[in-house]
């Protein structure tokens, strides 16, 4: 096996392991965030039963759906996240070779920074093309608030993908894809670009203390998450449209979704669940740091 192929596989393995561990750890926060984002577009949650905020959601979920329901959709998330994060990291390094070949980070800072932004954004958009149906299914499973199997909209990952495909075809599994690409480019560009640039400007980038790495990563994930959050809210709302017919369809398209959320719910609605997203971002920061640590041993 060539050195390049071995390096690619190491990136894939290290990124995937780090992602699976961290996403399982923050799964309850992830579900709370998703419910707050999409409850307004859910057929299962009437206006009077909507969650009032993070604490209300955390208290009611175990009472109404059982404690283990905090991890509803987590299996789909791990399955989805393994290739997503692994491909992101692996492609990121390939794109860095394209955008940053021959660039001196000390003498050409802005070109180095722009190259990191481009490689991070391109990596995120590329991997999204492959795994979007899994991301869609994870969202719909997490948004399913039925207690028993008889009250659930879907009985699992396979059931979700099958039902939506039969109802809407492949298009249904890619609902909200365009706004997802916009959001993922913004998020990944900051996530990878700023992180790599900050680490690259340190005296010894390959031997950075784990606490310093974590602090840099934490700042990056928090900022990137908040900047791209409105795009995430719109794409989740669009995902909730699949499988609906006639009067049940809330939004005719992405632009209509942006417009209706702003008009009917106000600008704050774009940031519902954003605080839980910041907490969840700790998991994202942990992924970056864990990835660097795993690569030292793989």
Swiss-Prot record:
<feature type="modified residue" description="Phosphoserine">
    <location>
        <position position="149"/>
    </location>
</feature>
<dbReference type="GO" id="GO:0005741">
    <property type="term" value="C:mitochondrial outer membrane"/>
</dbReference>
<feature type="topological domain" description="Mitochondrial intermembrane">
    <location>
        <begin position="292"/>
        <end position="298"/>
    </location>
</feature>
<keyword id="KW-0813">Transport</keyword>
<dbReference type="InterPro" id="IPR023395">
    <property type="entry name" value="Mt_carrier_dom_sf"/>
</dbReference>
<dbReference type="GO" id="GO:0015866">
    <property type="term" value="P:ADP transport"/>
</dbReference>
<dbReference type="GO" id="GO:0017077">
    <property type="term" value="F:oxidative phosphorylation uncoupler activity"/>
</dbReference>
<keyword id="KW-0812">Transmembrane</keyword>
<comment type="function">
    <text>ADP:ATP antiporter that mediates import of ADP into the mitochondrial matrix for ATP synthesis, and export of ATP out to fuel the cell. Cycles between the cytoplasmic-open state (c-state) and the matrix-open state (m-state): operates by the alternating access mechanism with a single substrate-binding site intermittently exposed to either the cytosolic (c-state) or matrix (m-state) side of the inner mitochondrial membrane. In addition to its ADP:ATP antiporter activity, also involved in mitochondrial uncoupling and mitochondrial permeability transition pore (mPTP) activity.</text>
</comment>
<dbReference type="GO" id="GO:0043209">
    <property type="term" value="C:myelin sheath"/>
</dbReference>
<dbReference type="GO" id="GO:0005757">
    <property type="term" value="C:mitochondrial permeability transition pore complex"/>
</dbReference>
<dbReference type="InterPro" id="IPR002113">
    <property type="entry name" value="ADT_euk_type"/>
</dbReference>
<dbReference type="GO" id="GO:1990544">
    <property type="term" value="P:mitochondrial ATP transmembrane transport"/>
</dbReference>
<feature type="topological domain" description="Mitochondrial intermembrane">
    <location>
        <begin position="200"/>
        <end position="210"/>
    </location>
</feature>
<dbReference type="GO" id="GO:0015078">
    <property type="term" value="F:proton transmembrane transporter activity"/>
</dbReference>
<feature type="transmembrane region" description="Helical; Name=5">
    <location>
        <begin position="211"/>
        <end position="231"/>
    </location>
</feature>
<dbReference type="GO" id="GO:0008637">
    <property type="term" value="P:apoptotic mitochondrial changes"/>
</dbReference>
<feature type="modified residue" description="N6-succinyllysine">
    <location>
        <position position="272"/>
    </location>
</feature>
<feature type="topological domain" description="Mitochondrial matrix">
    <location>
        <begin position="131"/>
        <end position="178"/>
    </location>
</feature>
<protein>
    <recommendedName>
        <fullName>ADP/ATP translocase 1</fullName>
    </recommendedName>
</protein>
<feature type="modified residue" description="S-nitrosocysteine">
    <location>
        <position position="160"/>
    </location>
</feature>
<keyword id="KW-0007">Acetylation</keyword>
<dbReference type="InterPro" id="IPR018108">
    <property type="entry name" value="Mitochondrial_sb/sol_carrier"/>
</dbReference>
<dbReference type="GO" id="GO:0046902">
    <property type="term" value="P:regulation of mitochondrial membrane permeability"/>
</dbReference>
<comment type="subunit">
    <text>Monomer. Found in a complex with ARL2, ARL2BP and SLC25A4/ANT1. Interacts with ARL2BP. Interacts with TIMM44; leading to inhibit the presequence translocase TIMM23, thereby promoting stabilization of PINK1.</text>
</comment>
<feature type="transmembrane region" description="Helical; Name=1">
    <location>
        <begin position="8"/>
        <end position="37"/>
    </location>
</feature>
<feature type="transmembrane region" description="Helical; Name=2">
    <location>
        <begin position="75"/>
        <end position="99"/>
    </location>
</feature>
<keyword id="KW-0050">Antiport</keyword>
<dbReference type="GO" id="GO:0005739">
    <property type="term" value="C:mitochondrion"/>
</dbReference>
<feature type="binding site">
    <location>
        <position position="80"/>
    </location>
    <ligand>
        <name>ADP</name>
    </ligand>
</feature>
<feature type="repeat" description="Solcar 3">
    <location>
        <begin position="212"/>
        <end position="297"/>
    </location>
</feature>
<keyword id="KW-0597">Phosphoprotein</keyword>
<feature type="modified residue" description="N6-succinyllysine">
    <location>
        <position position="147"/>
    </location>
</feature>
<feature type="repeat" description="Solcar 1">
    <location>
        <begin position="6"/>
        <end position="98"/>
    </location>
</feature>
<feature type="binding site">
    <location>
        <position position="92"/>
    </location>
    <ligand>
        <name>ADP</name>
    </ligand>
</feature>
<dbReference type="Pfam" id="PF00153">
    <property type="entry name" value="Mito_carr"/>
</dbReference>
<feature type="modified residue" description="Phosphoserine">
    <location>
        <position position="7"/>
    </location>
</feature>
<feature type="short sequence motif" description="Nucleotide carrier signature motif">
    <location>
        <begin position="235"/>
        <end position="240"/>
    </location>
</feature>
<keyword id="KW-0999">Mitochondrion inner membrane</keyword>
<feature type="modified residue" description="N-acetylglycine">
    <location>
        <position position="2"/>
    </location>
</feature>
<dbReference type="GO" id="GO:0005743">
    <property type="term" value="C:mitochondrial inner membrane"/>
</dbReference>
<feature type="transmembrane region" description="Helical; Name=6">
    <location>
        <begin position="274"/>
        <end position="291"/>
    </location>
</feature>
């Amino acid at each position: 096996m060539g050195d390049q192929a071995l390096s690619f596989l190491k990136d894939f393995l290290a990124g995937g392991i780090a992602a699976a561990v961290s996403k399982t750890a923050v799964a309850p926060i992830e579900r709370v965030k998703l419910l707050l984002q999409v409850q307004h577009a859910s057929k299962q949650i009437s206006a009077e039963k909507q969650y009032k905020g993070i604490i209300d959601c955390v208290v009611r979920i175990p009472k109404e759906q059982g404690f283990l329901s905090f991890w509803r959709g987590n299996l789909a998330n791990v399955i989805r996240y393994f290739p997503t994060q692994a491909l992101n990291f692996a492609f990121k390094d390939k794109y860095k070779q394209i955008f940053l070949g021959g660039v001196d980070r000390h003498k050409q800072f802005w070109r180095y920074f722009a190259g990191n932004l481009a490689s991070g954004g391109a990596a995120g958009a590329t991997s999204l093309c492959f795994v979007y149906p899994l991301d869609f299914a994870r969202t719909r499973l997490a948004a399913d608030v039925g207690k028993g199997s008889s009250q659930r909209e879907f009985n699992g990952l396979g059931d979700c993908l099958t039902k939506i495909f039969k109802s809407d075809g492949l298009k249904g599994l890619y609902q909200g894809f365009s706004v997802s690409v916009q959001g993922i480019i913004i998020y990944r560009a900051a996530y990878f670009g700023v992180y790599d640039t900050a680490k690259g400007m340190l005296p010894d980038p390959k031997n950075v203390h784990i606490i310093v790495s974590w602090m840099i990563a934490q700042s990056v994930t928090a900022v990137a998450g908040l900047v791209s959050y409105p795009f995430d809210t719109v794409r989740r709302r669009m995902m909730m449209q699949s499988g609906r017919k006639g009067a049940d369809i809330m939004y005719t398209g992405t632009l209509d979704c942006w417009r209706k959320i702003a008009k009917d719910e106000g600008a704050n609605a774009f940031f519902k669940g954003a605080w839980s997203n910041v907490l969840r971002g700790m998991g994202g920061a942990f992924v970056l740091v864990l990835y660097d640590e795993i690569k030292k041993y793989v």
